[in-house]
Regions:
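C-terminal scaffold of the Radical SAM
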Residues: 1-132
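A short, conserved structural fragment
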Residues: 148-158
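Residue-level detector of family-conserved "landmark" positions at structurally sensitive sites
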Residues: 23-25, 137, 157-158
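Accessory beta->alpha helical hairpin/"wing" motif in late/C-terminal subdomains of nucleic-acid enzymes
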Residues: 156-166
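Short secondary-structure capping/turn micro-motifs that flank functional sites
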Residues: 29-32, 143, 164
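Intrinsically disordered, low-complexity regions
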Residues: 43, 144-146, 159
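Short amphipathic alpha-helical interaction segments
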Residues: 133-149
Length: 166
């Protein structure tokens, strides 16, 4: 709780004093690092491995139990090394399971990515890119009232922004 938060803030202060800038929620980089530049310019991305400057929507997993991301969803290779080897020898691939993205998954994924990378998200803008009606999402943002009352976020005209230091 509070002790862990205080530790994180002490570490952040030390890193910032040493010339690092905060990237997203849990990374730091030197001001001239490509991640820091991407964060400042609004082109930072995040995948399940962390923050990145790479906008590619494909991430290929190699080896037993690896997870990959393709435009249509996630795939995971066989977990056990013997099953992985047998599958590769037999079929050339060891994909053991997959999860296909729905349009809603893609929409929610971009919303989460923007919040994690930019600390703000423009719901109407993202909905327009996904040919989705923003009305329900904007209405659901009213459920964030407690966070807004606590000064952690602001919600204005469909834009949700995390307050600095929240």
């Amino acid at each position: 709780g509070a002790e862990r938060h205080a530790q994180a803030e002490a570490i952040a202060a030390s890193l910032q004093d040493a010339g690092y800038v905060r990237i997203g929620i849990d990374h730091y980089a030197r001001r001239d690092d490509p991640l820091a530049i991407a964060a400042r310019s609004g082109t930072l991305h995040r995948n399940f491995q962390g923050y990145t400057t790479d906008a590619c929507d494909t991430l290929i997993g190699f080896g037993a139990s690896s997870i990959g991301r393709l435009p249509m969803g996630y795939v995971q290779n066989a977990v056990r090394i013997d099953a992985y080897r047998d599958a590769v020898d037999r079929a050339g691939t060891a994909i053991a399971r997959s999860c296909r993205f729905s349009e809603q998954d893609r929409l929610r994924g971009e919303i989460i990515e923007r919040l994690m990378c930019d600390y703000s998200v423009d719901l109407p803008e993202i909905c327009a890119r996904h040919d989705a009606d923003p009305t329900a999402l904007i209405a659901s943002a009213s459920g964030l009232g407690a966070l807004e009352e606590d000064g952690l976020i602001t919600v204005r005209d469909g834009v949700i922004a995390v307050a600095p230091g929240a």
